[in-house]
Amino acid sequence: MRLLLTLPLLLSSGFALPAQAQRPYVDPLAVTGRMAAAACPEPEIVQGGIPRTREYLTTITKCLDKSWSKHLAGTRRTFRKPIVRYYDEPAPRVCGLDWPEGAAAFYCTERATLVFPLTGRWIEDRTDLYPLKVAAHEYGHHVQSLTGIRKHYESAAARAGRARRAELGRRYELQADCLSGVFLGSVWGSLGRGRGDWEALLDATRASGDDDGERRSHGKGANRAYWLKRGFTTQRPGSCDTWPAPPARVA
């Protein structure tokens, strides 16, 4: 059992890879094309001073279900919605493991479960677009599981040394960032959001990088923003193939 975490804020596949970046899987998303534009009725995360985080995330998750089920319909893979769990406060254990310290949200791989704490700095200190992005990122891990990317990544990581295993993990997380951008780009026109909102979200994403931390799990802020923007701009999951990217792009 693995937990794929989102921590709180404090290229094409047709060429040979450098040895340090060896691809664990031929990207099955490359042939799926552009995600269709869709409407996602974004509710207020706070209404009349009352936090409505659960209602907000429930609505967004339904949008993610709809968009990804439609997009993956032609991949010959069975689409299954993830289970969604909400917690008003951290529990001693979740998905059979200890609650991960400092996690904003996470995906339980074997149980295909999205876990959202409903309190904390990730909710309180950010634009409501950041919870939207976090939900889309964790859903990206669900897509990686559905398409077989996760299984092949874990197989490659199990055979790798410490440094390469960490790099593979960042490639995996940055791909989820990019997939979140694909979804955001596909629904952006329905959100009534402007350029300033997008820039604020990019700034929050840059600030969520692990540039200064000992734990190098999700990538530098600049790289997180790069992959988010790449997915948002192209709206093509195939553009999120982080596995052949140069090491500097996944640092």
What are these regions (language model features)?
Residues 145-173:
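Post-HEXXH active-site segment of zinc metalloproteases
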Residues 96-129, 145:
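Active-site scaffold of zinc-dependent metalloenzymes
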Residues 69-85, 151-154, 187-201, 214, ...:
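Surface-exposed patches in mature extracellular/periplasmic domains of secreted proteins
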Residues 46-57, 119-130, 161-170, 191, ...:
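Second-shell loop/turn segments in exported
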Residues 59-61, 65, 72, 171-209:
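Short helix/loop segments within enzyme catalytic domains
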Residues 30, 206-251:
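Pan-zinc metallopeptidase signature
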Residues 68, 133-146, 177:
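Active-site recognition of the HExxH zinc-binding catalytic motif
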Residues 3-95, 232-246:
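A metal-dependent hydrolase signature that marks the N-terminal structural subdomain at the beginning
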